[in-house]
Structures are given as C-alpha cells and as structure tokens.
Amino acid sequence: MLTRCLKIGIVCPYSWDTPGGVQNHIRDLAEFLISAGHEVSVLAPAADDENLPSYVVNAGKPIAIPYNGAVARVLFGPVAFSRVRQWIANGDFDLLHLHEPAIPSISLLACWAADGPMIGTFHAASKRQKIIFAIGPILEPAIEKLSARIAVSEAARLTLTDHLDTDAVVIPNGIFASHYSQGTPQPQWQGNTIGFIGRYEEPRKGLSVLLEALPMIARFAPDVKVVVAGPGDPSEVQKSIDPQLRHRFTFLGKISEQDKANFMSSIAIYVAPNTGGESFGIILAEALAGGACVVASDIPAFDDLLGHGEFGALFVSEDSTDLAKVVIDLLRDQDK
C-alpha cells in the first residue's frame, strides 16, 4: 500500500477553458489525488490564466484543429516544447500522467521530453484516425516509453490497437457521483423536460437528431420542454426548429458544475444523440448519478456504458423516429 506523498504531473492536451469530458476527468482526478495528500500539477493549454485552478499551469494559447469529427483546441510546436520541458524540470515529478499522448499536443511533447515513470491514458475512439496513421512512425517510439497504458473504454482500446499495434488496460472514467446525487432540483427544469449538454454546434453531438424527433414527441406530450446547456450560438440552431416549437427550447449557455448537478437532478430525461467519435460518455454517468433517465444513441461507447440497455435506453444512431419512440415510451412509463 502506498503511504508516501507523490509529486504527480498530469498533462491535459485540450484547452482547459473549453468544456469537455477529458478536461472534466482530469480535473476530478487531480482533485481526488490532492485530497489524498499528493502534490499535483496539471499542465494544460488555456486562452488566459483567468479562473484557472491553483493546480493548473497554463502552457499557452491553443489553436483549433479538426479532429475526430469535432474541433480540438490543442498546443504544439517548438515554443510549447520548451514550456513543457521547463514544467517537467521545475516539477521534479515522481510520475507523469499523459492524456491522449498519440495526438500532436503537449501530451506527446511531454512524452518526448520526459524520462522516468509515465502513464498514458487514451480517450479517443474512431474507426480510422488519419492523423495517427500519418505520424505513426514518430509516435511509436514515444508510446513505447510509457510505463503503462490506460484506455477509458473498450472502444478506445480498440482504436489504440488498430492504429499503433499496442494494447492498454481498460479503466473507465470516474466521477464524484455524490456531487450529482445531491443536486438540488430546480422547478423550472422539472416536469416533462428533456435535457442536453454539450458543444451543440458540432454535428457529431447530434442535437439535430433531437430537433427532428421533437415534433413527434410533442404530439404525445404537449407540455414537453427541451433545455440545452453548453457553449455555442443558439441563433443558427433556432432557425432549424419548427416555429411552433421554438418556445419549448431554452438555451442556457455554459453552466457551472453546481448548475449541472442541479440540472441532472431536475430533468425527466437526458438525451445523448451523439452520432460517433465518443469513447466513453462521462455525461451519461453524470446524468445517471443525478437520477435522470438516460436515452442515448447506440454507438459502441454508449452501448457499453449503459450495459447494452440495462442502465438506460438506446435508440438507433441518427434515427430521429426511433429516438422519438424511445422517449415517448419513457414518458408514458413515467405517467403510470
């Protein structure tokens, strides 16, 4: 049993000030390790230092690149490499934990720069990631430096084995379940309310599938409401909503962690209509912890997390009619 305090460095590849499952996982892991008595420093890109936790070191301003069906905000290049080396030297870490070290990011730079014990956690799930194939020859020596490799799901593990001919132990992302189970229900989000959280402007998040399903759902439940949280400009989305149904939508923008817990404790159904590119689905675990019924597309990661339908309802990915049917069945059951 480990009893001494460790100096642990964690590298986050994605911009800290952009909401995302990887960032949330790293935040929770860092705070858990700190609470256990360890000294933790997280290196992450960020637009500025405002609102960064005390344990996060800003590696520099990220740039946006298309990646895995979305837009990733990462940092790479010689200036970033210099900052990574300086952070490693100053930290004198017992252990480094690198997230997504197989993409051009500060995690890969840290893997190149560091020696000693290193763990790599792989989050991405995709049938074919061109960027990994393209830089495979320079990735493999770096990945071989890792003392241990973790995949957050079987889908992420298969992506790793397919692209880099190496394997990993599957350890799912953890959450502070009590944070969500102790959320305070909010009257404005109760009733026949469907919730959605995410970067809804990204097509793979699947909000358009929910929009297409809503007219069918509304015919069964005339009082149904949809509450959408997350960064983005709702004006374009609102144009695609049936004018007779626009009043049913509320766009909250980016919300705090406490508001997210209250949100999950209030809504009737959380819908995750993502069309692909997800390796775990931490938001589903948060919704379940908050007591919401979960309806998710049947992409592999969501299917695994929901126990093939045991812990939540699944619908055929990108099929708005099937989504409507599943939601209506749930609302009908809640009325009994």
Regions found by a protein language model. Give the residues of each.
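Conserved donor-binding/catalytic core segment of Leloir-type glycosyltransferases
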Residues: 186-205, 211-215, 227
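Glycosyltransferase donor-sugar binding loop
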Residues: 46-48, 197, 225-238, 253
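Nucleotide-activated donor-binding/catalytic signature segment of Leloir-type glycosyltransferases, i.e.
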Residues: 237-259
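Conserved acidic donor-binding segment of nucleotide-sugar-dependent glycosyltransferases
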Residues: 308-309, 313-320, 329-335
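Membrane-proximal helix-turn-helix segments that form the acceptor-binding/catalytic region
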Residues: 126, 132-149, 162-163
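Short hydrophobic beta-strand element within catalytic cores of glycosyltransferases
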Residues: 269, 293-296
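N-terminal strand-loop element at the rim of the active site
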Residues: 5, 12-19, 26-27, 31-79, ...
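Carbohydrate-associated surface elements
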Residues: 155, 174
